[in-house]
Swiss-Prot record:
The gene is tig. It comes from Vibrio parahaemolyticus serotype O3:K6 (strain RIMD 2210633). InterPro entries: PPIase_dom_sf, PPIase_FKBP_dom, Trig_fac, Trigger_fac_C, Trigger_fac_C_sf, Trigger_fac_ribosome-bd_bac, Trigger_fac_ribosome-bd_sf, Trigger_fact/SurA_dom_sf. This is Trigger factor. It catalyses: [protein]-peptidylproline (omega=180) = [protein]-peptidylproline (omega=0). One of its GO terms (cellular component) is cytoplasm. NCBIfam families: tig. It is found in: Cytoplasm.
């Protein structure tokens, strides 16, 4: 086998491979003999058919199969010999493919970029310093009460925090438009669900009042025919309601699965959940900054093949979230996922180089701690821990998580780290949307 390597544009490489004719002919003959030995042919005892007859019947098909197998096998031998690391499947193209002559073919593919980490000392990370305070717990309890609240009709004016039931009819230039009409429509004032000016026009009104308001649809409104249009809404307020919060008692507490200990037990459980959430938020915020700095300091070429693989993964995940099927996923435009896919590949390559350069291996104690921490969110942590320990795939997933965290720790160790005190809500509101 003869091999030459061409460097094309960017990460693309081409191998020119020559395979001696004897190798091809020997492989074709061996396969034809295998067919002659194992298949039945009319007029011949099994295994006694002449090889020339088998070659006449199956020669072309066998040769094509052999060429495919030979190209794949010699490609693998060539990349091992040349110490090349492909980033995706190759494209084969025969150059010379005559019977009795050497096979000459090319294999074109992308390679992984050579990454040399730099600038880790320039990365800046602001570590949040925060804790769950009593006021944070009380605020969360109030949020839970609001979630369990009921609405009661009141003889008061509509204002933020109240809910109104309204009839409305919208029109543009005197003509009603589709979707602009509703009866007994519930609208929570201050929630910002409607277009600008709509809630303002209702504020201060009481049940039984009928009136018109003038509004303008935003330029970025989702309905193309309404973008930027001036509209008039005829509105009738049917009723105004106020939120009635449940009392903070044992009955309320029981709704959250707290059987004993009353309000104090609920507060303790809420605090525990908030502290777990806070710990994860701090970890996420630090990781986010470390990765952002790593990407900023290290621009690398990205193999298109890896981006395509990641786009495929993101498509499948999107289809699963919306209850779709694999065929539907393939129809989703690649542009929806391209930027995120490229980012994932870049981060993966850079973190992989951190792991390699720091010679990191998943720490067993860290893996154990991560599983135990995750298990605390479940009713029976010991059952969850046992499940992980008995499932090798789940353990491997957790080892990968641990290894990534160790890579982040390695980046932080070389970065410029400062600390800043922040409140619980402030920190959680900084978390990016998933």
């Amino acid at each position: 086998m003869q091999v030459t390597v061409e460097t094309l544009e960017g990460l693309e490489r081409r191998l020119n491979i020559t395979v001696p004719a004897a190798n091809i002919e020997d492989a074709v003959t061996a396969e034809l003999r295998n067919i002659a030995k194992n298949r039945r042919f009319d007029g011949f005892r099994k295994g006694k058919v002449p090889l020339k007859m088998v070659a006449k019947m199956y020669g072309k098909a066998v040769r094509q199969d052999v060429l495919g197998e030979v190209m794949q096998r010699h490609f693998i031998e060539a990349i091992v010999k040349e110490k090349i690391n492909p980033a995706g499947a190759p494209t084969f193209a025969p150059v010379e493919n005559k019977e009795g002559a050497d096979l000459v073919f090319t294999a074109t593919f992308e390679v992984y970029p050579e990454v040399e980490l730099k600038g880790l000392e320039n990365i800046t990370v602001e570590k949040p310093l925060t804790e769950v305070k009593e006021a944070d717990v009380e605020e969360m309890i109030e949020t839970l009460r609001k979630q369990q609240a009921t609405w009661v009709e009141v003889e008061e004016a509509a204002e933020a925090g109240k809910r109104v039931s309204i009839d409305f009819v919208g029109s543009i230039d005197g003509e009603e438009f589709e979707g602009g009409k509703a009866e007994n429509f519930p609208l929570e004032m201050g929630a910002g669900r409607m277009i600008p000016g709509f809630e303002d026009g209702i504020a201060g009104k009481t049940a039984g009042m009928e009136f018109d308001i003038d509004v303008t649809f935003p330029e970025d409104y989702h309905a193309e025919n309404l973008k930027g249009k001036a509209a008039k809404f005829a509105i009738k307020v049917n009723k105004v309601e106020a939120r009635e919060l449940p009392e903070l008692n044992d009955e309320f507490v029981a709704k959250f699965g707290v059987a004993e200990g009353g309000v104090d037990a609920l507060k303790a459980e809420v605090r525990k959940n908030m502290e777990r959430e806070l710990k994860q938020a701090v970890k996420t915020r630090i990781k986010e900054q470390a990765i952002e700095g790593l990407v900023k300091e290290n621009e690398i070429d990205v193999p298109a093949a890896l981006i395509e693989q990641e786009i495929h993964v993101l498509r499948q995940q999107a289809a699963q979230r919306f209850g779709g099927n694999p065929e539907a996923a393939a129809q989703l435009p690649r542009e929806l996922f391209e930027e995120q896919a490229k980012r994932r590949v870049v981060v993966g390559l850079l973190l992989g180089e951190v792991i390699k350069s720091e010679e990191l291996k998943a720490d067993d104690e860290k893996v154990k701690a991560l599983i135990e921490e995750m298990a605390t969110a479940y009713e029976d942590p010991s059952e969850v821990i046992a499940y992980y320990e008995q499932n090798e795939q789940m353990m491997n997933n957790m080892r990968n998580v641990a290894l990534e965290e160790q890579a982040i720790d390695a980046i932080i160790a070389k970065a410029q780290v400062t600390e800043k005190e922040v409140g619980f809500n402030e920190l959680l509101n900084q978390q990016p949307a998933a």
